[in-house]
Amino acid sequence: LLKFIGLKISILKNKNTIEIKNIDKNISTLAPYKLVKTMRAGVLVLGPLLAKSKKAKISLPGGCAIGTRPVNLHLFALKKLGAKIKIKNGYIFAEAKNGLKGASITFPSISVGATENALLAAFYAKGKTLLRNCAIEPEVKDLIKFLNVLGGKIKILGRKILINGCNKIKQNIKHEVIFDRIELGTYIIAAALVGKKIKFNKIDPKVIKNEIDVLRKMGVKFKIQKSTIEVFKSSKIKKISLSTKPYPGFPTDLQAQLMVLMTKAQGISRIRENIFEN
């Protein structure tokens, strides 16, 4: 998708690194269905394309087909920043002839994707933007860290995010992306299921503290150090009841894995799904 838009991308496999060059030249404002249909995250090009090019045509996203998952909160935030938007034939048409301008935006409900799209758009907008009722997932915080490395002035205040529009982007910057906490949680639950001693390195245990607390209540044993988590064989898995919630609550993306572990427990365990309606 990024290559189609016009970015020059090199994948340095030996360094596990992606290098992006010439990000301001020959940028397309179209993100077609054939690319965006495969992944929900494709809609995240809408905010920055609109902010930089003053227009964008983005296919409605596909992929990750859980729940109805509308993009109404994404569009709600962009309209507050000054965009004119219409949806036709499966595409989002967005325009801001005079550019995006900072605004005060309160999300009706918490959304990771909408928070990220608003962040990316506000980063390029003129003036200050205040986002309220934001998602504060580690991935959102990592995006903010990256944007600040690029030259942004973004602060997190609880569930509020204050963004000062960036006039000049720094070049030749480096950023190390945060580890995938859902992958980590999946492997930890797998370790608990098979009853093997497994050690996970180069991670931040604080990021998945809630998940570890839940698993400890179920009888899973851990040894936790600054950047490692060690899972030990558990003699008995205990029943538990919990609800999925936005971060820092238990993530919906781990409830299916946890359900498998629950089959090992004595008694009846329960999960209430609060993020997706189906």
Each language-model region and where it sits:
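Short, structured segments at the rim of ligand-binding sites
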Residues: L1-N278
